[in-house]
Amino acid sequence: MGVIGIQLVVTMVMASVMQKIIPHYSLARWLLCNGSLRWYQHPTEEELRILAGKQQKGKTKKDRKYNGHIESKPLTIPKDIDLHLETKSVTEVDTLALHYFPEYQWLVDFTVAATVVYLVTEVYYNFMKPTQEMNISLVWCLLVLSFAIKVLFSLTTHYFKVEDGGERSVCVTFGFFFFVKAMAVLIVTENYLEFGLETGFTNFSDSAMQFLEKQGLESQSPVSKLTFKFFLAIFCSFIGAFLTFPGLRLAQMHLDALNLATEKITQTLLHINFLAPLFMVLLWVKPITKDYIMNPPLGKESIPLMTEATFDTLRLWLIILLCALRLAMMRSHLQAYLNLAQKCVDQMKKEAGRISTVELQKMVARVFYYLCVIALQYVAPLVMLLHTTLLLKTLGNHSWGIYPESISTLPVDNSLLSNSVYSELPSAEGKMKVTVTQITVALSSLKNIFTPLLFRGLLSFLTWWIAACLFSTSLFGLFYHQYLTVA
């Protein structure tokens, strides 16, 4: 079988690399520990005593004696104390104490490995053009998506465990909002949003009915269109709920990063990075793509500028470039988050009253402690967009070349396979060959049911939906942090 050929070798080599090399040379660790990120250290109690002008306390009458032990009152200092936090570069030792660091490192490093496997497989398919092999890189991409969704689910459940129900209410509210939004989008005709979902589902239903007829069963569609869209909307609502806080956090980091940026080019890239999901959403709006990109009006005539296949390829490349830009701007956003420690201290100085030294230390240390949570909220949507796009290219039978070319198909000689099944092979080896051939026929039948048209429509919609959810939540977060919070 072709399945145990070059692709399996590539998978085994990459598994060995992940086990032997990545623990020593990790991209996830380098993104945090390359020396560009600086975190704020919390002041010690002795430093706070000196700043507050207090001497080391001895035993006083105010101390309580309880079961033979003396409990002293917690030390408090004025909030308007002249405190300046010291910074330090993030090192590998510092990351050991970070919450969710193993999950962050695993997701990023596994994504790198899966992307390399995908690239090698694409080169192999481009030159060798195998027709009877399973594309193992698809399994890697699906694993990446499952890990990203699992991490986002874990982060979302963390908000449900908090005693304060504010975060829980936000997740539930946005979940219902995205469910209604998904149902509304799925009702819109393809004259406005060109996912190809209707065409793909119709092709799936027809192929399934033909398959059932060949098996001598009643020729009914396995699932109705309404049921399909209902369950798809439920899945989309969960994705939207998972992306709620990543979008809200992105908006806050975007505003803080803009305040830190001094160069015009950096500010421009930050704006493009924030609007990247909107650009992705507009790529599937048919009036824009058909009337202004593919057939731009020049005078009284509209001249075709490119074919649909060329535009599909350009759309894939644009999404990948925007994902690369988001990864490049990761450092600016994480540094903007780390600066929240000093920002909280500056805000505290404007308030009246006193604060305990323990609370002050917790307020400063908490920012760095949750650095990997913020990094996951930044990286996970990026990973989902990237690998959904890669799946769209492969399963949707698109091409990477922008020049017109015939789209390759994967023909399966069903007649030859069927003849092999019913050929008489009395030996044990012959029976094994019959079993293998029957499995091959079953897989080819599944290929005829789950066609590229179905995957193209479904994955186009999911890619668009992830970008739409991310932009919706980040836009709401921008409005909230800009106008509804007290500066």
Curated annotation (Swiss-Prot):
GO terms for cellular component: plasma membrane. Pfam families: Tmemb_161AB. The keyword Glycoprotein applies. Its main location: membrane. Glycans are attached at residues 34, 135, 203. It comes from the Eukaryota. The chain crosses the membrane at residues 107-127, 136-156, 169-189, 228-248, 265-285, 305-325, 367-387, 459-479. The keyword Acyltransferase does not apply. One of its GO terms (biological process) is regulation of cardiac muscle cell action potential. Keywords: Cell membrane, Glycoprotein, Membrane, Transmembrane, Transmembrane helix. Belongs to the TMEM161 family. Essential for maintaining normal cardiac rhythm in the developing heart and for neonatal survival. Inhibits potassium and calcium currents in the cardiomyocytes, this assists in timely action potential repolarization and thereby maintains normal cardiac rhythm. This is Transmembrane protein 161B. It comes from Homo sapiens (Human). The gene is TMEM161B.
